[in-house]
Amino acid sequence: MKKQSKGVPTNRDIRWDRLDNTAHLFPVIAGESMSNVYRISVTLKEEINPELLQRALDMVLPKFDGFNLRLRQGVFWYYFEENGKAAPKVRMENNFPCRYIQQNKNRSYMFRVTYYKCRINLEVFHVLTDGMGGINFLKELTYQYLRLAHKDLQEKLGDSLSVDTSLNREDSFLKNYKKSSAKGYQTKKAYLIRGEKLRPGEFGVMHGYMKIPELKRVCHAMGISINEYLVSVYIWSVYTECLHGMPSKCPIRVAVPVNLRPYFNSITTKNFFVMVSAEFHPTKARSTGKILKSCFPITFPMKNC
């Protein structure tokens, strides 16, 4: 008779869960050339202690059912199954970000935690959750790490979860689904940015830094959100650098993920977002303001341009 490993659930009590509506796509299309892995980082004022970060992960992971999972393939659909193995090993960052996660080399988990100097990185396979779910996990991981690193915080805060951490696993897509008549739509082929093709697993990263108060001041003056402004600046950059401000038959299109939780009063840690296209048709010389009007005609108040 096989001895059951300590900490690994038996067949009778293994927890399983369905993938949410969006997650079904990711296991099918994911691979070395399209990892569907995103990264969220937090930078502290002190260098990271890897041993304490590992301890923090060991503490946090069992409390998050949505991360303590592995992916299984059924007859028709993929599904989640409780993992139960020790947490993945925290490693110093020494490779490209957002690489494809090979579960058989990661204790069957679909996320990784790395560090570099003062920065903690959380990389997540999108099948688990979206960016808000990742932020929820990283905030708790950082919270527990700081408790371990600073004894005065241990005494003040205790070892429970922070107040605003959510463990909700509701499928908000199903809860808020309303049947409607299907409407067809047509889109033009978008402008394709060309450049150096990297090998599978390699990613080019550009870092941009700006002062938040100044960014907020500009957005407030124009009556728009930070997201709307940054998307429009990105489109304007493509328009000026790639098209050199000239007209094009193909529109510049940016797919923007929109968090649906505020609109449906949801705190789920599963995926709950929708992709919205911001589109600009370059027909003549335009300013950033004109691009804003073109991409966000409903929210942009048509002033200060």
Describe the predicted segments one by one.
Residues M1-F76, K85-R112, N121, H207-M210, ...:
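Acyl-thioester-dependent acyl-group transfer interface
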Residues E47, V127-L128:
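Helix N-cap motif at beta-to-alpha junctions
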Residues H126, C219-N227:
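Alpha-helical hinge/cap motifs
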Residues I226-I235:
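Short amphipathic alpha-helical segments
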Residues K2-N21, R119, L128-N136, E140-R217:
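Non-catalytic, low-complexity flexible loops and terminal extensions
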Residues K117, E123-V124:
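Active-site acidic Asp-centered loop
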